[in-house]
Amino acid sequence: MHVCFHGGGGGGGGRLAKSFNVISDFTKILIGRRGGDHALARRRRMRQCKDAAPAAAAAAVASASAKIAPEEEGEGGGGGKEEEFCDKCCSALSGGGGAEEEAAAEGEREWVAEPEPGVLLTLAPRADGVSNRLRRIRFREEVFDAWAAQCWWADNHDRIAELYCLVKPDDDDDEEEAIAAAEAAMLPATPCQSEAEDDDDDDGAESSSRSPSTSTFSGGPSSGSGGGSTGTLGSPILGLVTAPNTTGGGEHDAVRDQHQPTAATWREWVEEYEPGVFITVGAYPGHRLQLRCVELSREKFGEVKARVWWEENKARLHHLYSF
């Protein structure tokens, strides 16, 4: 018996090959679908980016216009008027501050000189560029007291005026008065003078120019009007001039001579009014005592305390004595 397996074997191989072909085709289809999904996603993202670009551009334009708008509004409200600026500080120049600017410039031109330690001079240059104006004089308290400052200015006034070309203008009365007042305030007052000094002094008009009722304080050393106390430079005496000396010539002397006895009977002496206070008293026989000079000891009184004492006791002394 002859059996042939060729036909049967060939049919099975064809079905197997067909099955492989079907599986291969199905796999290709699946791969193609997956790739298509990725492509669709990419195309979708590209469309979204294209749609968002105009919106972003519009937002940027709106933001830029919002930032520029205030400047444009300011330019429109200015009415086309251009504002001037300073070349040095780039600040706006206004037309209404001419006087203030001039005063500020005058203040900027002032300068301070220190001719000696503790002495400060505030100077302002004049228009000629050579001379200066003296604005202020300041003394340091730790170096000078009131009396030392007065003495320094009295001794160095001419030297300072020559050194810094201080000129007193003739055409400026206000400045002239200010300088004169400053000099009068800084110079020490005239101390008490004795009767012998007044006798030697030929010029009696100067002594009679002071009012009898005026009391001026002398910060310097003084000499008593009688024979009791005489002061030299550095004397521990503070003098108070209460009246002009009656032995010199003047209107006061003429009036006194009409109502009083001869000058030969006039007497003066020194009394100690209280500890550290010496008064020079003068009188005619049988007449009221006249207070000629008040002197205070430097050991007990300083410059300020002496002035305070005089203001507190002036009325009482005026009640006891005639000035």
Curated annotation (Swiss-Prot):
Location(s) in or outside the cell: Nucleus
Keywords carried by this UniProt record: Nucleus, Repeat
Main subcellular location: nucleus
GO cellular component: nucleus
Alphabetical list of InterPro entries matching this protein: Brevis_radix_dom, BRX-like
Pfam families per UniProt: BRX (PF08381)
Bias (Low complexity) ranges: 206-220
Biased composition, class Acidic residues, residue ranges: 195-205
Record carries keyword Protein biosynthesis: no
Composition-biased stretches (Basic and acidic residues): 250-259
UniProt biased composition (Gly residues): 221-231
Region (Disordered): 185-259
Residues of the BRX domain: 109-165, 267-322
PROSITE patterns: BRX
Similarity remark: Belongs to the BRX family.
UniProt-recorded name of the protein: Putative protein Brevis radix-like 5
Organism: Oryza sativa subsp. japonica
